[in-house]
């Protein structure tokens, strides 16, 4: 998997203000706790939401407040994933959490129209992504052989179901290693790798592109405006695409 995936995955974060991101993270925690209960060990969605919140510096106090607040919250939110196409066949997945689906879909249609794209049928875009746990590790003072040795050691420490392949992919980049794991082993493998002294830069269970689309400057500018609109929309939780790089 090329390095440009790691660059593209950062676009959304750079454009999102910390306050806006914090609100979206808190909203997901509250919704996850309300649907699946307040215990993250028994609620995978809540566990993932807390993990992402901590990585983005949301305080433990705020996390607890939102978990506890979910019990008394009378609002009813519906979560959905929308798929769409952008310029040059760009593929996009959008996660929403909304109390008004009609408002949400109307807004998304407007964003896609300005992008010169369109909303797609369900599951027509997701075949360009895999859903897995991505672990990004610093390669400072770490060779590929060292990494593979530590991965094998970590696998010895966890219980693996027959026929499962916990490690889906490993890739070496200029300044980091990328490991993609099966979601159900994500937390255990990450914990073991941390215990073995590896420096984890970033980690998340997410959709990861399997192929990429490059855009010219004009189309890339449209994509940036599209992301700005999505990031400012309180109904939109996240956006991911298979954007590769800008071409002249």
UniProtKB/Swiss-Prot annotation:
Which UniProt keywords are given for this protein, alphabetically ordered? Answer: Cytoplasm, DNA-binding, Transcription, Transcription regulation
> Which parts of the chain are coiled coil?
none
Give one Pfam family: TACO1_YebC_N
| Location, primary (coarse class) | cytoplasm
GO MF: DNA binding
Query: What InterPro entries does the record tag this protein with?
Result: Integrase-like_N, TACO1_YebC-like_2nd/3rd_dom, TACO1_YebC_N, Transcrip_reg_TACO1-like, Transcrip_reg_TACO1-like_dom3, YebC-like
Q: List localization entries.
A: Cytoplasm
Cellular component terms (Gene Ontology): cytosol
Give an example GO biological process.
regulation of DNA-templated transcription
Which family is annotated? Belongs to the TACO1 family.
Q: Which HAMAP family match?
A: Transcrip_reg_TACO1
Annotated protein name in UniProt = Probable transcriptional regulatory protein MYPE8020
């Amino acid at each position: 998997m090329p390095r440009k995936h790691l660059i593209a995955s950062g676009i959304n974060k750079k454009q999102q203000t910390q306050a806006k991101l914090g609100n979206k993270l808190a909203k997901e925690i509250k919704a996850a706790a309300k649907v699946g209960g307040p215990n993250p060990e028994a609620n995978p969605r809540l566990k993932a939401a807390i993990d992402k919140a901590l990585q983005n510096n949301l305080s433990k106090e705020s996390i607890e407040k939102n978990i506890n607040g979910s019990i008394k919250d009378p609002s009813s939110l519906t979560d959905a994933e929308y798929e769409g196409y952008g310029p040059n066949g760009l593929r996009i997945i959008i996660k929403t959490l909304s109390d008004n689906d009609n408002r949400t879909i109307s807004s998304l249609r407007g964003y896609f129209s300005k992008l010169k794209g369109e909303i797609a049928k369900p599951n027509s875009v997701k075949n360009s992504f895999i859903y897995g746990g991505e672990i990004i590790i610093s390669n400072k003072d770490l060779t590929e052989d060292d990494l593979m040795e530590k991965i094998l050691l970590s696998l010895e420490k966890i219980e693996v179901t027959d026929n499962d392949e916990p490690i889906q992919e490993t890739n070496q980049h200029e300044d980091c290693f990328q490991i993609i794991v099966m979601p159900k082993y994500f937390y255990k493998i990450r914990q073991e790798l941390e215990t073995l002294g590896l420096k984890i830069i970033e980690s998340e269970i997410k959709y990861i592109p399997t192929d990429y689309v490059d855009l010219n400057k004009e189309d890339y500018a449209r994509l940036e405006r599209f992301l700005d609109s999505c990031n400012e929309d309180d109904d939109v939780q996240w956006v991911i695409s298979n954007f590769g790089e800008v071409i002249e």
